[in-house]
């Protein structure tokens, strides 16, 4: 529903865009590859608290689940995210029988953004590991009281089967999670920006996060963007990665921004977003906003903010804490 006009808007995936559930875009489910050999071989298990986003699902509401966690291998942007895009496209474009969808393997590869010119062996080498990682990603819904615990455990994809000789792919999803595939708070994610950011996984990850935000978003803290990337390097290095990724997003024409500081906290003010990487006919619709002037902070408040930052507590964390009370 377009809030400004009241018009019902249908979002349809095609080769240039995909409809992505907002939850998976905002959460750190798909993250950059850990570059260093030291980090790439350990701590590869990712654990994400998805309670705030996924307790809105009818499954969680019906069963009274109050905690949702996503656990599994790190899913990267360069291969795994594109495979997930292919899965979303498959369920949107093809006839779903029961909880399964079947389509030609070559077509599935195209939906994953893999050129059909690649050999069958190279297709398998790219798709097979990604399907295994996605199928190995567990989503658990639970509720615990003083005496008992109830938990429902499922997977991002229940099963995947392919046969290159017969040219088929079969994908099976948990019917109770179909709502996740067709979440009511969807955004249209343009793949043009993703394709323009080949091998720039940090920029790709920040793009999926920023594009999921509402129109005229509030300033985004540097700490929040660090959390979205879920890197393992020192904070100083992570800050450099975030700034480099934001500059890459500006270079391809997706956005413009200003970095500001309030107290000891750094923020990015987003002036506009252009998922098609070109200016609209009416640029006034972008509502570019000047950066908010830095608010004067008392020395006492500055000390408190510095202590919170030292403890790794962000303003987002405080907001969630107050909401939960």
Swiss-Prot record:
Q: One biological process GO term for this chain?
A: DNA replication initiation
Q: Does the keyword Signal apply?
A: no
Keyword hit for Amino-acid biosynthesis: no
Annotated GO molecular function terms are: DNA binding; DNA-directed DNA polymerase activity
Give the consequence of mutating residue 60 to D: In copy number mutant
Region Disordered, residue ranges: 279-298
Q: Which UniProt keywords apply?
A: DNA replication, DNA-binding, Plasmid, Plasmid copy control
Record's family?
A: Belongs to the initiator RepB protein family.
What function is annotated for this protein?
This protein is essential for plasmid replication; it is involved in copy control functions. In vitro, binds to the DNA repeat units, BCDD'D'', EFG and HIJ.
This protein's name: RepFIB replication protein A
């Amino acid at each position: 529903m377009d809030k400004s006009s009241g018009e019902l808007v249908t979002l349809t995936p095609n080769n240039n865009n995909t409809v992505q559930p907002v939850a998976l875009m905002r959460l750190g489910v798909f993250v950059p590859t850990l570059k260093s050999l030291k980090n790439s071989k350990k701590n590869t298990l990712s654990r994400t608290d998805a309670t705030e986003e996924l307790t809105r699902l009818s499954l969680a509401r019906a069963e009274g689940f109050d905690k949702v966690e996503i656990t599994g291998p790190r899913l990267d942007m360069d291969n795994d995210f594109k495979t997930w895009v292919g899965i979303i496209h498959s369920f949107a474009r093809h006839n779903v029988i029961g909880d399964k969808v079947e389509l030609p393997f070559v077509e599935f590869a195209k939906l994953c953004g893999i050129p059909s010119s690649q050999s069958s062996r190279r297709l398998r080498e790219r798709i097979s590991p990604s399907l295994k990682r996605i199928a190995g990603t567990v989503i658990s819904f639970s509720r615990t009281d003083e005496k008992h615990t109830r938990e429902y455990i499922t997977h991002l994809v229940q099963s995947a089967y392919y046969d290159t000789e017969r040219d088929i792919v079969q994908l099976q999803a948990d019917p109770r999670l179909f709502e996740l595939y067709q979440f009511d708070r969807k955004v249209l994610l343009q793949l043009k920006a993703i394709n323009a950011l080949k091998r720039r996984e940090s920029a790709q990850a920040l793009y999926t996060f920023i594009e999921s935000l509402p129109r005229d978003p509030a300033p985004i803290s540097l700490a929040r963007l660090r959390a979205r990337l879920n890197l393992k390097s020192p904070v100083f290095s992570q800050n450099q990665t975030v700034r480099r990724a934001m500059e890459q997003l500006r270079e391809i024409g997706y956005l413009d921004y200003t970095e500001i500081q309030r107290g000891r906290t750094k923020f990015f003010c987003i002036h506009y977003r252009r998922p098609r990487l070109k200016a609209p006919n009416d640029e006034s619709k972008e509502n570019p906003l000047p950066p908010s002037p830095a608010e004067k902070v008392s020395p006492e408040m500055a000390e408190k903010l510095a202590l919170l930052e030292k403890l790794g507590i962000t303003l987002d964390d405080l907001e969630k804490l107050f909401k939960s009370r």
